[in-house]
Amino acid sequence: MKRTLCAGVLLCVCCAASAQNARFTLLGTESVVQLDRVLTTGREHFLPPSERPKGYQWPRYQRAKYPVAVYRVDYRSVIPELHREPVEASGLLAVPLVPGARTLPVLSYQHGTVFGRYQVPSYAFSRSNPSGYPQYSGAFESRLMVAQYAGQGYVVIAADYFGLGDSDQPEAYTLKASEQQACIDLYRVAMAFLNKRGIGESRLFLAGWSQGGLVTTAFLEKLQTLGIRVTASFTAASPNDPFAAMNAWLYHPTPSDPLWENSIVALSLFSYQHYDARPGLVMSVIKPRYYAAFKRIYTRDYPNLVALNGLLVKIAHHPGGLLGYFRKRYQNSTYLADSPFGRLLAASETYQEIFHSPVRMYYGTKDEVIRVAVAKLAERYQIAMGSSSVKTMKVVDADHHGTFLAAAWDSLGWFNSFH
């Protein structure tokens, strides 16, 4: 009876509590039945069977053990690139209701690129959002990680990143320092919140998919600098070096390259222009006729995701693939390397730090976004520096989404082995 009461007290007390300038709003409690539904039927919306590559095997997730209390977290942070200008940020905290628990493992999950402002962790369990159109399905990755990990007894935290969710700034896309700051400040307020209620951290793990893989290794760098121990991390389909990834898309295109690569260019350029205070950067890189459409992509100025897809298709009708959006001087790959845009991309890399804890990097053999050579960059660099901390993990016949599903499943057993 006493053990069960502990979980109940946590729920009741946490609803309106705050810690270190943060507000924690209880969104509800996900039952094990609801969590299991995410792990089974939910994934078929994320990767429909009709789009699944031939030969890909569905992972078989473990059934959830515990119900999970889900909170939206609103907290204060600062923007390193803008001289530590204050910013309102948001994220998610998911606490498994483990009877009598005094310490729990913690997983910080970093989400991938989203095309709706509210397709983020803090809105992953909300059917409505301030945008006026549904974005619930686009936040499946965050629900899966909560179901897979919090359902097995891990506390899960996940930052939205600056400019997404309820944040009051434009999106800070692939801006290393800002993404590190968003993650570390959420970690601090979440741990203070739990500690105040008698729950400590037993071990810290990190994970991220796609853009979130890049953020994960950036966060790992930050934690190492601060002397905060990380037990282990995994990434899935991570562009460890944004410059190398962009170079491959521009100068070595393949038939399988996705249409939405143009949105990556838009998000990156406008983020760099705003946060690195480089007026005119966007116009110096892309042809003027694409400026308005790229700005709409960055600001999410479209009524729904169908309209976004229509916009992407409309501006894709030109020769030259992704490079066709760029000014003529960018036809030379050397120019990109020496340009402000190229240098900003290169500064976003997150694999040249020697990691002090093991990292698994999953890549799919049929990933339409991340080339195998890019996926293996971090491991090869670490080996060259005498480190064996990074290990790449091949997911046979997996595309970009399938790689994430497989990594989320396989990593649980690996993380559990450290307890």
State each model region's role.
Residues 337-344, 348, 360, 369, ...:
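C-terminal catalytic histidine-bearing segment of alpha/beta-hydrolase fold enzymes
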Residues 355, 360-367:
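Short beta-strand/loop motif that positions the catalytic acidic residue
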